[in-house]
Amino acid sequence: EWTLGELGPAARNEMKKRDFDTGKRMFTAAACLACHRFGNAGGMNGPDLTGAGGRFSAYDLIDHVLHPSKEISDQFAPIVVTMEDDDTVSGIVVNLNGDSVTLNTDLTNPNQRANVDRRKVKSIEVSKISPMPEGLLAALNKSEILDLVAYVISGGHPDHPAFR
């Protein structure tokens, strides 16, 4: 399992002459598109990464991937619904209709849904756990991770300075 201590210095000092093709392959291998929009492709269940390079440094992007629950956008924060019988359901609200709440319980499958009767709800809390799993970089080596981050920062443009 990678740490920010291991990858942070490289994110600050080794972001030139990265490999675009490897970065693009790693973006696919790490399943980023399952939840994140990038250009004209990908999911809508996580933040759009197209302009991430204008908002985050390489260091910050690595920190977000290593620690996805550190900061969760309100737009993508799951909720935990506790029912009167103490059963719980977690997910992203996709529909509120009268006495019914529909949650997407699996962000990689938009059809995985649970309907909750609001009249039987004991409590609703915003989850402190990101739907983005930890360990997404575990199977990649350091060079592949840096190429992946360069790819995201570039917005998918091979002529970006990170690849020169």
Regions found by a protein language model. Name each.
Residues E1-K17, F38, Y151-R164:
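Post-cleavage N-terminal segment of exported redox proteins
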Residues D117, V121-A138, K142-E144:
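Intrinsically disordered, low-complexity linker and terminal regions at domain boundaries
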Residues L7, T28, L66, K70, ...:
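Sec-exported extracytoplasmic/periplasmic mature domains
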Residues Q75, N95-D99, T108-P110, V126, ...:
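Low-complexity, glycine/serine/threonine/alanine-rich intrinsically disordered linker
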Residues A30-L33, D99-V101, S130:
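Glycine-centered loop/turn positions within well-structured domains
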Residues G42-L66, P78-V126:
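Gly/Gly-Pro-rich "capping" loops immediately C-terminal to redox-active cysteine motifs
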Residues G23, F27-G39, L49, L148-G155:
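The canonical Cys-X-X-Cys-His
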